Amino acid sequence: MTGPHPETESSGNRQISVAELLARQGVTGAPARRRRRRRGDSDAITVAELTGEIPIIRDDHHHAGPDAHASQSPAANGRVQVGEAAPQSPAEPVAEQVAEEPTRTVYWSQPEPRWPKSPPQDRRESGPELSEYPRPLRHTHSDRAPAGPPSGAEHMSPDPVEHYPDLWVDVLDTEVGEAEAETEVREAQPGRGERHAAAAAAGTDVEGDGAAEARVARRALDVVPTLWRGALVVLQSILAVAFGAGLFIAFDQLWRWNSIVALVLSVMVILGLVVSVRAVRKTEDIASTLIAVAVGALITLGPLALLQSG
């Protein structure tokens, strides 16, 4: 590696060390490096070395061995020439860096626990202990707050009850009568269990008397309107027959006296009957209207037919 160089032989046979050769090649003949660094490049300097986190250790002292070996290499003529030793880099800064390396500040630490460690608890003694929560206070009647004013719902008045007109409702009376008859039939049916018989016998006399009196009063109230309605219908029928007979006799005389007046009055009577029926029925019933027209024609035009036939 460190053979004699022709330039050194001409200048006094001085032998050049490997360090000098490397220095010359690095200054003059070193090829241009690529900008991209490679992992295997020993001359590359990392970011950690630039920032100072990792000490930079140069391996210049490793070249001392080859330099000494090169200085003692024999020359071509058989003589051993002692060359000049290459200037070595001082080893003191390296030693200082190695000594200062343990004292550098560590930039990482062990992960701390997520929850802090609880302090040691004292040893509890046996016996009752006070609770952490206070006991509830006892409130007497005097401690209670006075009742406040009633809510708005209590001040509200109920809706007025609608007064329905007094109508004769046959359907309601019929349903009530059927329900009472069905109840009586069920009570009179044989084959009931002894439990129902015992329950009926064990009822108080007051309840039985009250129910019986209420039933009798209800029946009495039901009988009176029924009789009154029947008598009213019979009376209306008698009055209608008498009124129709009177009109028939009157139109008989009118047709004999003046037929024109009798015709006008007959039309008016028929219209009056139709209006009366509609007012009484309070419904638009075609059958009732036709019946009223037929009765009016019979009363007013019947005498004319008898006169024409006689």
Curated annotation (Swiss-Prot):
The chain crosses the membrane at residues 231-251, 257-277, 286-306. Residues 198-209 have a biased composition (Low complexity). Residues 56-66, 183-197 have a biased composition (Basic and acidic residues). The modification N-acetylthreonine is found at residue 2. Its main location: membrane. One of its GO terms (biological process) is biological process involved in interaction with host. It is a multi-pass membrane protein. Keywords: Acetylation, Cell membrane, Membrane, Transmembrane, Transmembrane helix. It is found in: Cell membrane. It comes from the Bacteria. One of its GO terms (cellular component) is plasma membrane. Residues 22-163, 178-209 are annotated as: Disordered. To M.leprae ML2433. This is Uncharacterized protein Rv0497. The lineage of its organism: Bacteria, Bacillati, Actinomycetota, Actinomycetes, Mycobacteriales.
